């Protein structure tokens, strides 16, 4: 079994996450959004990404792609990294239908706050592939984020702590940090892995890891290179610097 897992890093990482229910990590995993081509995904993995995220959508989200491109990315990545699919949709059936051809390792739910109840997430779990884990986004605007994280922790596999912005649908992609003291309290109080997002960059991720001690860290905005006002690609040098800085923090 151990030998097989050495050849399947994606499964090994997921086993480490869910079997041991680590809510902190000596070396945080690195999640990078958002992949727009297979080549970009492979480059991010080579630069240090453990989890790679895609945004299959037609809502005008940053870096969104269609389902066919998302499938191509996941097929190319295969077991080289944990494959994450993000959705801001609010209809359970629509989400399940969208995920059916993708079969992500992790489904990242980030519709607006209070869209779903824990019971609805349980219903969604019954509609998707049983091997797909669920990551629930919590907007850390104030201390009410703690109550939300505690309410959803029993029904999901990960919590991701992010920062909302009124200009983008759902939770995240703001490029702004939030109160890391609240995030640290959530990490300490829930019994599932917590990924810290929201304005993280190569310059501040080490301080974030030191302050919060999350299971993982996530970056979108500050590892991009803009080719026009609303069009970006991943800046692989920034991804590499982000991953290195996150992992350089002393345990």
Give names to the regions the model predicted.
Residues 16-123, 130-167, 171-196, 200-216, ...:
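Conserved N-terminal beta1-alpha1 strand-loop-helix module at the mouth
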Residues 3, 8-10:
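Short, low-complexity intrinsically disordered segments enriched in A/P/G/S/L with frequent Arg
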